[in-house]
Amino acid sequence: MDSLNSILSAISAVVWGPFILIPLLLGTGLWLTIRLGGLQFRALGRATRHVFATDSDDESPEGDISNYQALTTALAATVGVGNIVGVATALSIGGPGALVWIWITGLLGMASKYTEAYLGVRFRTTDSKGEMSGGPQQYLKRGIPGPLGSVLAVFFAIFAICASFGIGNLAQANAVATNMESTFGIAPAATGAILFVLVGSVLLGGIQAIGRITAAFVPLMIIVYVLGGLYVIFSHATEIPAAFAMIFSDAFTESAAGGGFVGSTIMMAIQYGVARGIFSNESGMGSAAIAAAAAKTPHPARQGLVSMTQTFIDTIIVVTITGLVIVVGGTWDMDRDEAGIMTAEAFSRVLPGDWGGTIVSLSIIFFAFSTIMAWAYYGERSLESLCGRKASIPYRMFFACLLFVGSVSELELAWTFSDLANGLIAIPNLIGLFLLSGLVARETKAYLAFDPKLNKPVDEVRAFVESQGMDWK
């Protein structure tokens, strides 16, 4: 295992180094921000309206789930272990300054998330069962002419399947098993068996079942965790200004060693901030476009705006809560091998009894469970794009069995594999976003000119779509 982890770490270091993924992620996000005229900043308020829109005023018959369910499914995939353990890992290696780079990745990533969700709906198709099928595997192949698009689509599908086993399975199952053992004394093998049964049962219901469950549980999970985090932060109210000063200072200077912290460079802050940022919000990975493609929406821009809010909620709200809890709680300089308990320790120092550790442990368990379900859908859709519907059942069976492996395996290997898979899945998608940015910018501009307040009735929007010759349904 150690030799395998070393090999994967070496490859991951190259992929996530200063010459490949970091400039590609930040550069594409900046480029899309410019092409879309800072859409993530000027339309965020209007986009929020569509998150809570009712079926009658914002949805069209085409699609499998509501736009709200598409958002919560995407949130289920992103608001997971990365928001708690991932952020702690970034701070333990990159220092408090890594949080700034997570924010930058998130803000620029909102433009990427809008673009990939837009394209997910724009190029979606209907499969043999009458369900919507979309995502990078569709818009890369159908949107980019020539063999390049097809090649990128195949690579994305392969890497997405790998990512579903990493970020969506091994890392999540390991986190659940670790917390079940530390909090409730349940053996990892028993947790693996429970996950196998629960996830397997949900997967039998497909995207509709996943959408219903995430719509019910994800908002509640986020609210409980955020409220607990805010209580911890304001219990250290006098230390908040110093915490922000440290965060911004360390983002652009080297962090000195102290406690269990061995020090970090600016490059480490950037590398781990960006890596954990994408692990948290998945902007640029293309995964959320698969859920967006299943949404009932009269125009791609509407779902793009809804999906864009997911990155804001995930990174600017939930990740910020975790980061501030760790910094003001004084646990960020613990030994990096203890990154998994940094957040719980910060909670426990403020909340009475075992409440702190229990809240964090339960949050990790429920966040991870919802992430597993969403990524099972992403991986299945990606495999179907290569092998057809016949591959669905074997994939679900293997995915469920792998949860047991993740529950009893080493955390370091699970995270290393997840980091590498995240990087590989993003590369073909980011290339596609760059090449298709002109199409998205042009059609978004036309739509916002037609519906600047984003409140046109569905029938008028559909008539506009037809007048533009957009054959996207």
Regions found by a protein language model. Name each.
Residues 116-124, 228-246, 254, 258-260, ...:
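Extracellular/periplasmic helix-exit of transmembrane alpha-helices
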Residues 3-4, 36-40, 83-87, 164-176, ...:
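Transmembrane helix-loop junctions in multi-pass membrane proteins
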Residues 38-65, 89-99, 103, 111-148, ...:
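Flexible loop linkers connecting adjacent transmembrane helices
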Residues 1-81, 91-98, 109, 404, ...:
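N-terminal alpha-helical transmembrane segments of multi-pass membrane transport
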Residues 108-116, 193-207, 218-238, 271-276, ...:
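Selective recognition of specific alpha-helical transmembrane segments in multi-pass small-molecule
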Residues 28, 32-33, 105-130, 141-174, ...:
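Helix-loop-helix module between adjacent transmembrane segments
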Residues 24-28, 32-48, 156, 173-180, ...:
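Membrane-interface loop-to-helix entry segments
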Residues 57-93, 119-137, 141-143, 158-161, ...:
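Alpha-helical membrane segments and immediately flanking helix-loop junctions
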